[in-house]
Amino acid sequence: MEWTDEGIVLGVRRHGEGNAIVELLTRLRGRHLGMVRGGASRRQAPLLQPGNTVSATWRARLDEHMGNYALEPAVVRTEVLMRAPHAAFGFTHMAQMLHLLPERDPHEGLFLTLGAILDAFEDRESAGRLLARFELALLAELGFGLELETCAATGSRENLVYVSPKSGRAVCGEAGAPYADRLFALPRFLVEGTAPPAGDVEDALRLTGHFLLTRVLEPRGLGLSDARAAFVSAWRRSTAPV
Amino acid sequence: MPRAVAGPEIERLIQLIARLPGLGPRSARRVALHLIKKREALMAPLAAAMTDALGKIVECRRCGNVDVCDPCTICTDTSRDRRTLVVVADVGDLWALERAGVLNAPYHVLGGVLSPLDGVGPEDLNLAKLVTRVHEDEVGEVILALGATVDGQTTAHYITDLLREAHVRVTRLAQGVPVGGELDYLDEGTLSAAIRARTQM
């Protein structure tokens, strides 16, 4: 068995003294593990850092084997992830969330989203918006996508300003007004793709955080990660007026 | 499965030696044979030294270093500059810095770095004592001597956040071209870090 694909390094574990088991989010084959011979060496260490995109060739005798990776660097992002706290915490959180995906289950959309986010993650102001978009995409891939296009009560596509915490569907201003204190605010940028003010990003992270917690993490006995809290705190500091 | 060539005691010795870093089954046999040949001159003192060390080694409750006394030799060394505290991931890193002899300050050993995919979270590291030490010892500067890896620097950012309220100067080691390193052989990440951290001549 042999294939070649692009992959983003999610994590690396030392295996024995000289080898490493590398976890990639590949473009066409989802989250996929493989062993890199000599992966614990000093020469390979800069390549095998989380967040880097690599060109991966996987070989094994049988498909169900873990197999061996031969990796070549494609995009090296180590410097940004090491320097910017929001990027380091944000990536850690995203890698943890991607770990929830079943192995070898293709999620090309998430691969493309993660790559695009990592390329733009250095910009602190857009990092919050990007993370909220990642979480929305992850919810959708896990089968818990939010329906933000039409009002759950009236079917209207206009004046969508709330989201129901129970159904995950948008609610228009007229229908939602009596229950406004119990509904989430729907940030416009999630629907329209416009550049949001910081307050909208806060709303978006609150929204995606709630659905990640109640629909994905709590049923698995998990909570929102420390890394996410650290990301939000680092992002808030970077966008706070001086 | 190769046939045993010696009695169970010797085979067990070989198996245990093979579990040491840098040694495989073949080299373990060579080490075992060397010890057997020098039973009186090497094997007996080694066994005695290991038994002695096993009974005496303790982890310093103050800094997490290993020594035969608690607090450890470094913590009780009054010639060290108490206004500075050097944070390292493991005892091996502490020994490396001591070998270099460039710092004369106490240390704090975390016991690893954050690695959520491996299940290492903040509660698994020696962080609570670090915050307490920084406050109680009136530390002026905390040097984060952690590895230049994404996990190492994520840990450094996390500690910086933890110490935000302590109003202490938090620094980290420089990253860039290693001594003896030729640019042609360096990876893009190292070069990028080196360019960003360039200094005026």
Swiss-Prot record, chain B:
Pfam families: RecR_C, RecR_HhH, Toprim_4. It comes from the Bacteria. A zinc finger (C4-type) spans 60-75. Keywords: DNA damage, DNA recombination, DNA repair, Metal-binding, Zinc, Zinc-finger. CDD domains: TOPRIM_recR (cd01025). GO terms for molecular function: DNA binding; zinc ion binding. Transmembrane segments: none annotated. Residues 83-178 form the Toprim domain. GO terms for biological process: DNA recombination; DNA repair. Belongs to the RecR family. HAMAP family: RecR. May play a role in DNA repair. It seems to be involved in an RecBC-independent recombinational process of DNA repair. It may act with RecF and RecO. This is Recombination protein RecR. It comes from Xanthobacter autotrophicus (strain ATCC BAA-1158 / Py2).
